[in-house]
Design a protein with these regions (language model features):
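Non-catalytic DNA-recognition/assembly elements of restriction-modification systems
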Residues: 4-31, 57
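Proline/glycine-anchored alpha-helix kink/cap motifs
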Residues: 14, 159-160
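DNA target-recognition domains and sequence-specific DNA-contacting regions of bacterial/archaeal
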Residues: 23-159
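Short acidic (Asp/Glu) and glycine-rich catalytic loops that position anionic groups and cofactors
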Residues: 1-3, 103
């Protein structure tokens, strides 16, 4: 039995409240600090995730292949630990649970559980439920120079 059908089976016959993704999570897009500014990349200690991290090290990650320095962080705000990165452009739907404060490139949208829901959800359940979100993302893409997810629909995706 696949992980997804097991999760769906667990909810069979159970009353649950379904909430839109944007109500449960703070959503932020990733970005790539300028490669021309050497100080952004020299002696960095902040994990900066790319698709290669998932491909090479799996879906639950506590370290990245590349690091950036604190001066590369826009507004001084990192994505929080125990948040989920999901690819919303190019390689649609790939996702990972990140267990440390971090940043990621622009292909990812970060899903950070809102504090008001911290006691309501288990982040690992949400991570596994993101396999359903990933499937939805692959079916709801727009094409321009590269594939990207319908972000209006993405924000409305329902979470049990």
């Amino acid at each position: 039995m696949s992980e997804l059908s097991y999760l769906e089976k667990l909810m069979d016959g159970v009353e649950v409240e379904w909430l839109p993704l944007s109500k449960v999570f703070n959503l932020r897009n990733g970005y790539t600090p300028s490669k021309t500014k050497k100080e952004f990349w020299a002696n960095g200690d902040i994990p900066w995730f790319r698709m290669d991290d998932i491909r090479e090290n799996g879906r639950i990650l506590g370290n990245s292949l590349q690091k950036i320095s604190s001066c590369a962080v826009k507004g001084g705000k990192l994505f929080p630990e125990n948040s989920i990165l999901i690819s919303t452009s190019a390689t649609i739907g790939e996702h990972a649970l990140i267990t440390v404060p971090h940043l990621a490139n622009q292909r990812f949208t970060c899903l950070a559980l809102k504090e008001s829901y911290a006691d309501c959800f288990d982040i690992k359940f949400l991570f596994y439920y993101c396999f359903s979100l990933a499937e939805w993302c692959r079916k709801n893409t727009t094409m321009s120079s590269f594939a990207s997810v319908d972000m209006d629909g993405f924000k409305k995706f329902l979470i049990p």
